[in-house]
A protein has these predicted regions:
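Short coil/turn segments that connect the beta-strands within blades of beta-propeller domains
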Residues: 22-25, 83-84, 131-134, 168-170, ...
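Blade-loop segments of beta-propeller domains
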Residues: 61-87
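Conserved beta-strand position repeated across blades of beta-propeller domains
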Residues: 18-20, 80, 128, 164-165
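Structural core positions within WD40/WD-like beta-propeller blades
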Residues: 24-37, 87, 134-137, 172
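Short, low-complexity, intrinsically disordered N-terminal segments
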Residues: 13-27
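Surface-exposed loop/turn elements that mediate protein-protein interactions on large endomembrane-trafficking
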Residues: 1-17, 36-70, 93-122, 133-163, ...
Length: 216
């Protein structure tokens, strides 16, 4: 058998990487991954998985960076890349804080971008960072879509509707139907009040160079 050229990337146990969209980086999160809802449950159970790790891997060099280290009771969510910077979400359940860090691509300058207090009933369900620009959102189990930062607002969405991404003052959602055949519909809502402005068969796909394609 021909020798296969396989390059080893030492990640200290993190075995799955995802593309950091818009950049040449990949990232990986261990244990509960990016699910901060599950992370909160682990914290409340005093589980042995009392924190997680977030790494970045450069391409094509394959250099591994671990720019931030979580303490007990702290968990990272999915990072996003926007305007040449990396944004990292961390939930600090000990102090009931949500912290967003920002970093350059070389991880030479990392600082707190914003720090928010967790609400009393915060369950971190579907809590995540999105772009463009960087926005902290969550969708509750009762189909209430909420923006937590930079501007707080909330509105109801359809049970089959899910948030995809933001384009400046527009919020892009997708909704699926089975009537009886499966199909999808793209929906554009206005930021921040959520008024539905447009809907069309298909879905909106963002290319690497920032083009928006209606596919379907």
């Amino acid at each position: 058998m021909e020798e296969i050229n396989i390059r080893k990337i030492p990640t200290d146990g993190i075995a799955y990487l995802r593309k950091l969209e818009g950049s040449d980086l990949f990232y990986g999160i261990d244990h509960c991954g990016d699910d901060l809802y599950e992370a909160k449950e682990l914290f409340e159970m005093d589980h042995r998985l009392d924190r997680n790790r977030l790494i970045f891997v450069t391409y094509p060099e394959g250099i591994v960076y671990e720019p931030l280290t979580a303490e007990k009771g702290e968990y990272f969510g999915d990072p996003v890349f926007d305007e040449g910077l990396i944004f990292i979400l961390k939930a600090d359940f000990n102090n009931r804080k949500l912290i967003i860090y920002r970093s350059d691509l070389k991880f030479k300058e990392i600082m707190v971008h914003v720090q928010l207090d967790m609400e009393e009933d915060e369950d971190c369900y579907n809590l995540r960072l999105v772009r463009y620009p960087v926005t902290l959102i969550k969708t509750s189990k009762d189909n209430l879509f909420r923006i937590l930062w930079p501007l707080k607002t909330e509105f109801e969405i359809d049970p089959h509707e899910s948030f995809d991404h933001r384009i400046d003052e527009y919020l892009i959602f997708s909704m699926w139907f089975e009537d009886p055949d499966y199909r999808e519909e793209a929906i554009i809502r206005r930021y921040p009040d959520g008024e539905k402005l447009w809907n069309h068969k298909g879905s909106i796909f963002t290319t690497d160079d920032g083009q928006e394609w209606l596919v379907g």
